[in-house]
């Protein structure tokens, strides 16, 4: 999260202040790698509420994405090229280790074991999809959206339980969009929005159930926004004034737009319009700056520099 935030903020001084802490965290995780190449961790996102083993998929994926973002941030911090190469190599090796260590068949689905020895589906198998690891995208989404995991209130934390946390449902929706499964994702997002924002428990996403009795937390509302920004529009910071776009326009939509995005020390719009069955036109307009247009296939990667 930190390198994504620093890049998107466009604040060089803040990045210089926090870069040493980020480097420390990356080195700490690197020193925690086990013989199989994945980081060991005595806890995870759920802080011991459910089993996580000695090495879990959540920690591994978060570390992986931190390395990827660090390859963009390191040159801006004046680091030698060798540092960027090291982070890139470590990310490549970790991605392969995630597949070897966690990849497998669970409850008949070609997806991920949350930890070594895990034999039931877990909600956080969605995380690889959020970070561009799509080798098992179809099987993972089939599992998450199956009756074994999907309920009226979102995705269960663990197959066979009655516990749900909105954050994993929101990450799964973001991952579904990011992996190119936009039609299924928008269907599930529509149901979620009707249930949460317009239904019996309004007007925000909730934290969990039964713990906390569905109280509201601002973090979940932030994750809802990230379904749109990082999932549907596929925005990924690559510099203080640059980002990549991987726009996923659902087949039933003719257009979509985000207006007045405040990021990269700028104010800009992104609009996607369908121009043919296989092409969309993406327009990026910066207030007081240039307008750029791209005609691409849905999900095609675009590199944007704001100027």
Where are these regions (language model features)?
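Short, tandemly repeated low-complexity microdomains enriched for cysteine and small residues
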Residues: 241-244
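Short, well-ordered surface patches within globular domains
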Residues: 96
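Acidic, glycine-anchored loop motifs typical of Ca2+
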Residues: 37-39
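Active-site core of glycosidic bond-cleaving carbohydrate-active enzymes
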Residues: 8, 13-27, 48, 52-85, ...
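Beta-rich accessory regions
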Residues: 80, 86-89, 93, 101, ...
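Short, conserved phosphate-binding/catalytic loop or strand-edge motifs used
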Residues: 43-47
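Hydrophobic/aromatic-rich effector regions of fungal transcription factors
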Residues: 1-8
């Amino acid at each position: 999260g930190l390198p994504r935030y620093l890049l998107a903020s466009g604040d060089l001084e803040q990045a210089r202040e926090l870069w040493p802490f980020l480097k420390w965290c990356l080195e700490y995780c690197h020193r925690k790698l086990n013989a199989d190449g994945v980081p060991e961790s005595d806890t995870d996102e759920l802080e011991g509420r459910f089993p996580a083993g000695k090495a879990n998929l959540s920690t591994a994926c978060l570390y992986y994405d931190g390395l990827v973002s660090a390859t963009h941030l390191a040159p801006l911090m004046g680091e030698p090229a060798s540092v960027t190469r090291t982070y890139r190599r470590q990310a490549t090796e970790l991605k392969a280790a995630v597949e070897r260590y966690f990849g497998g068949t669970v409850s008949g689905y070609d997806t991920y074991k949350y930890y070594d020895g895990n034999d039931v589906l877990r909600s956080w198998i969605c995380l690889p999809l959020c970070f561009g690891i799509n080798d098992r995208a179809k099987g993972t989404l089939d599992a998450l959206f199956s009756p074994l995991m999907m309920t009226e209130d979102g995705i269960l934390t663990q197959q066979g339980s009655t516990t749900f946390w909105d954050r994993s449902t929101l990450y799964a929706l973001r991952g579904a969009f990011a992996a190119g499964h936009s039609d299924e994702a928008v269907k599930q997002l529509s149901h979620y929005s009707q249930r949460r924002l317009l239904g019996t428990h309004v007007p925000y996403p909730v934290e969990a159930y039964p713990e906390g009795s569905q109280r509201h937390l601002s973090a979940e509302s932030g994750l809802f926004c990230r379904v749109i920004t990082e999932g549907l529009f596929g925005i990924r910071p690559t510099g203080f004034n640059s980002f990549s776009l991987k726009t996923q326009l659902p087949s039933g939509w003719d257009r979509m737009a985000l207006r007045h995005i405040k990021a990269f020390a700028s104010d800009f719009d992104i609009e996607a319009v369908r121009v043919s069955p296989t092409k969309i036109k993406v327009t990026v307009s910066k207030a007081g700056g240039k307008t750029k247009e791209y005609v691409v296939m849905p999900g095609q990667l675009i590199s944007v520099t704001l100027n």
